[in-house]
């Protein structure tokens, strides 16, 4: 948003702001995006499942901010929809800044006439600890939404938000979740991802954990302990999915023990799409 504002402030017309990462735009010619990968046309997608799959695969292969190319989908006879490469991962400070904006922590009052939003009871007292997921589960679109590179909030930011939760009049002492796309991913899969992006054509955990995978739950354990120790907090649950193959790859069983002892609210939630048995 800041980049768009800067471009407008510099005097560029909207029609020429076609280069900002994480944005999609409409153009009449590919002259200004000569290196774009051309996807099947919109009409082809609506008529042929194989073309749809081919388009999806090209998009899937271009979700990494370090290696992705611009994508162009022909639409009609004179238009192209251009998708720019994803934005680079946010730093921890940027994550903190975004998540600590003065949100209202509830739905818009206009929904009252419809009876409210039932899901608010689950998410109102939940903490989002990070973005991104390198799990690669089948049928999961989170790679498209947030990318494979983990971006993490600081302990201090999460504790500040938890303290604000405890001041809500309907807070009963229970933090429902401290999670993300995958709860127990609190850092990138490896240090390479921060400078060179993710590996093309390879998964971090499938069919077996990569030899370069960093497996460590200590940061998450320490965060959960700090949250459990807060005044007015009775229980801290984890209701985001747990990748249990990542848990089993950890040489220490400390996280598994504390997970079972303190953080399961009746039934452990896992990310099952990476197994077939």
Predicted regions, residues:
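Acidic/polar loop patches that form or flank catalytic/metal-binding clefts of enzymes
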Residues: 13-18, 105-110, 148-151, 166-177, ...
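Hydrophobic alpha-helical scaffolding
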Residues: 81-88, 123-130, 144, 148-155, ...
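Conserved SAM/AdoMet-binding glycine-rich loop
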Residues: 164-277
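N-terminal pre-triad scaffold of radical SAM enzymes
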Residues: 112-141, 174, 267
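Flexible, acidic/Gly-rich N-terminal and inter-domain linker regions that tether
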Residues: 1-123
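Cysteine-centered iron-sulfur cluster-binding motifs in ferredoxin-type domains/subunits
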Residues: 125-138, 148-157, 161, 165, ...
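Short Cys/His-rich local motifs and their 1-3 flanking residues in nucleic-acid-associated proteins
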Residues: 142-145, 180
């Amino acid at each position: 948003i800041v980049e768009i504002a800067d471009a407008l402030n510099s005097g560029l017309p909207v029609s020429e702001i076609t280069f900002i990462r994480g944005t999609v735009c409409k153009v009449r010619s590919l002259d200004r995006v000569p290196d774009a990968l051309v996807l099947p046309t919109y009409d082809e997608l609506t008529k042929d499942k194989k073309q749809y799959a081919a388009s999806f695969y090209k998009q899937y292969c271009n979700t990494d901010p370090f290696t992705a190319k611009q994508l162009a989908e022909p639409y009609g006879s004179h238009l192209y929809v251009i998708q720019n490469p994803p934005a680079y991962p946010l730093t921890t400070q940027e994550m903190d800044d975004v998540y600590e904006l003065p949100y209202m922590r509830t739905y818009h009052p206009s929904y009252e006439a419809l009876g409210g939003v039932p899901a608010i009871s689950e998410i109102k007292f939940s903490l989002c600890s990070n973005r991104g997921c390198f799990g690669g589960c089948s049928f999961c679109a989170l790679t498209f939404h947030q990318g494979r590179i983990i971006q993490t909030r600081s302990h201090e930011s999460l504790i500040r938000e938890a303290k604000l939760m405890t001041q809500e009049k309907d807070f009963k002492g229970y933090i429902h979740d401290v999670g993300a796309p995958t709860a127990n991913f609190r850092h990138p899969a490896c240090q390479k991802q921060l400078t060179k992006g993710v590996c093309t054509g390879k998964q971090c955990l499938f069919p077996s954990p990569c030899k370069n995978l960093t497996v460590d739950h200590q940061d998450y354990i320490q965060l959960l302990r700090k949250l459990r120790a807060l005044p007015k907090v009775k229980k801290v649950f984890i209701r985001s999915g747990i990748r249990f193959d990542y848990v089993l790859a950890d040489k220490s069983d400390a996280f598994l023990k504390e997970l079972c002892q303190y953080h399961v609210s009746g039934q452990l939630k896992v990310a099952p799409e990476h197994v077939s048995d």
